[in-house]
Amino acid sequence: MDSTLISTRPDEGTLSLSRARRAALGSFAGAVVDWYDFLLYGITAALVFNREFFPQVSPAMGTLAAFATFGVGFLFRPLGGVIFGHFGDRLGRKRMLMLTVWMMGIATALIGILPSFSTIGWWAPILLVTLRAIQGFAVGGEWGGAALLSVESAPKNKKAFYSSGVQVGYGVGLLLSTGLVSLISMMTTDEQFLSWGWRIPFLFSIVLVLGALWVRNGMEESAEFEQQQHYQAAAKKRIPVIEALLRHPGAFLKIIALRLCELLTMYIVTAFALNYSTQNMGLPRELFLNIGLLVGGLSCLTIPCFAWLADRFGRRRVYITGTLIGTLSAFPFFMALEAQSIFWIVFFSIMLANIAHDMVVCVQQPMFTEMFGASYRYSGAGVGYQVASVVGGGFTPFIAAALITYFAGNWHSVAIYLLAGCLISAMTALLMKDSQRA
């Protein structure tokens, strides 16, 4: 453990409360944009992309192809983490965070004007995959910078709460993306929605980008980063991601294991179940679109509340509680789907994608960033977080759809997949030492 770097912090009196608030607000605003854009793709892939961009294959294969393009974004997230992390550790967090918002917004808006397969043939899916890769690259650099700036700027005993805006941005992004798709879906016919209605939410991203850039322009670099740069100005530096790998190789594996619960609970409910419930169960698409609205809205309240509890009672306790709730809800969720019981579908969707998910993500910012020294923290935490996204989340809808296809529509294998991921996260958190309070 690099005790010298990790324990080196600016005096608490130098931490400006106004700087902390601006960092929290800026991290939140950018996270809204990035997660709105990133999640919007998953929702639309479940409803539209199989027919608009892959019409030449069977419905089942079209669904797999659409979810595969969803996973492409995750493959490029580690690369974004490496590149943005490298320059973020050298040049500063703020510069990189301005650039990630620009890249994400432009890629998303271009998807909104992308011609379909019937217009330009195979160029349509090729360009779709390219733009999805740019989305993944941009969001790969977003989390590390936003998490670090908010954690490093926060008061010592309120780091989970002040950095929770990064994850609240996820909830607002989910709320906006699902809400806008749901609204347009209700206002258009199926033909209109498939033709042009789905494009409107992608173009709306431009408005969010301009707002986020205005907010982020008022942020400052954290005092901790500035002090670290001063101390190491004359030192010979290795590439930050290499430094992180050499000093803390086990931290990357821990982050992957810890994130399984979060990734599986969210993407199975918001992406896979949306497709599975409509195509296999005959349930209306509005059901899971409305569930996404509910989950996103509740997350705006529950994430900061759980973060406050974590600051008060310990991060690990809150984390383990969330993973156990996810474990216990896996099979009941699919049983409710099979029974087509709306009340229990909604209830267990909230237990998985809201309660379990939010108890886990609310403490990830301080938990993950404190595994690394300040001079390579953007690279270490960012790359670890994004590699976990590939391993645990990027192909979750694809894997779940493949399991359903392989087992002829039987959902038990997907429930086991979800349960196992939650248990792995629980065991990893149980074996960790709470860096704040056990």
UniProtKB/Swiss-Prot annotation:
GO MF entry, a single one: shikimate transmembrane transporter activity
CC terms in the record's Gene Ontology section: plasma membrane
GO biological process per UniProt: shikimate transmembrane transport
Compartments where located: Cell inner membrane
Membrane topology per record: Multi-pass membrane protein
Segments crossing the lipid bilayer: 28-48, 64-84, 109-129, 133-153, 168-188, 193-213, 255-275, 287-307, 318-337, 341-363, 387-407, 411-431
Keywords: Cell inner membrane, Cell membrane, Membrane, Symport, Transmembrane, Transmembrane helix, Transport
InterPro entries referenced in this protein's UniProt entry, alphabetically: MFS (IPR011701), MFS_dom (IPR020846), MFS_sugar_transport-like (IPR005828), MFS_trans_sf (IPR036259), MHS_symport (IPR004736), Sugar_transporter_CS (IPR005829)
A Pfam entry, by short name: MFS_1
SUPFAM superfamilies tied to this protein: MFS general substrate transporter
PROSITE patterns according to UniProt: MFS (PS50850), SUGAR_TRANSPORT_2 (PS00217)
Superkingdom of this protein's organism: Bacteria
Catalysed reactions, as listed in the record: shikimate(in) + H(+)(in) = shikimate(out) + H(+)(out)
Phenotype when the gene is knocked out: Disruption of the gene abolishes shikimate uptake.
Induction info: The translation of shiA mRNA is activated by the small RNA (sRNA) RyhB. In the presence of the RNA chaperone Hfq, shiA mRNA forms an inhibitory structure that blocks the translation initiation. However, when RyhB is expressed, it pairs with the 5'-untranslated region (5'-UTR) of the shiA mRNA to prevent the formation of this inhibitory structure, which allows translation to proceed and synthesis of the shikimate permease.
Classification via Gene3D superfamilies: MFS general substrate transporter like domains
S-S pairs: none
Family the UniProt entry places it in: Belongs to the major facilitator superfamily. Metabolite:H+ Symporter (MHS) family (TC 2.A.1.6) family.
Function: Involved in the uptake of shikimate, an intermediate in the aromatic amino acid biosynthetic pathway.
Protein name listed in UniProt: Shikimate transporter
Species this protein is from: Escherichia coli (strain K12)
